[in-house]
Each structure stands twice: as C-alpha cells, then as structure tokens.
C-alpha cells in the first residue's frame, strides 16, 4: 500500500483561468483580456479554456523584456 502522505503532490501543468489569475495576481477579467488580445496563450481541453504553465512563464518573460 502506498502512503499518500509521503508522496509529493504533482504540480499542475494546466491552470483554470481563475487559478492563472491568482498566480499572476490579476483579476479574472484582466486574464480574459490577455487571452482575447493573444498575449496569454491557452488550450481547450474537454470544453474548458486552460492556461498552460509554460504560457504563464512566457507572459511574465514578455513583461520583463518590455520593462
């Protein structure tokens, strides 16, 4: 039997829009605007719009380059 308490949690590869907003410290509306403008990449999986972890990193990198 595997002791689940000893296993490390698996980090998510995809975030719901609300989770992405929390990670970026932005409002949900602001994240949807970034998605609409093409500045934040998403994927569609099982009728859900999800934000890949890599897309969050790409967006933050673009902010750093623009600074």
Which ranges hold each PLM region?
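Polyanion-binding surface elements
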Residues: 2-33, 37, 57-63
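Alpha-helical residues within helix-turn-helix
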Residues: 19, 44-45
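A generic structural-conservation signal
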Residues: 30, 43-44
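Proline- and acidic/polar-enriched loop/turn elements at helix boundaries
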Residues: 33, 46-47
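Minor-groove-contacting beta-hairpin "wing" of winged helix-turn-helix DNA-binding domains
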Residues: 48-53
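C-terminal secondary-structure termini that scaffold catalytic or DNA-interacting sites
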Residues: 66-67
């Amino acid at each position: 039997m595997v002791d689940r308490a000893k296993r490390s949690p698996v980090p998510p590869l995809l975030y719901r829009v609300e989770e992405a907003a929390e990670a970026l410290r932005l409002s949900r509306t602001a994240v949807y605007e970034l998605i609409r403008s093409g500045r934040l990449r998403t994927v569609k999986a099982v009728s859900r719009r999800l934000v890949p972890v890599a897309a969050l990193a790409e967006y933050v990198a673009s902010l750093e380059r623009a600074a």
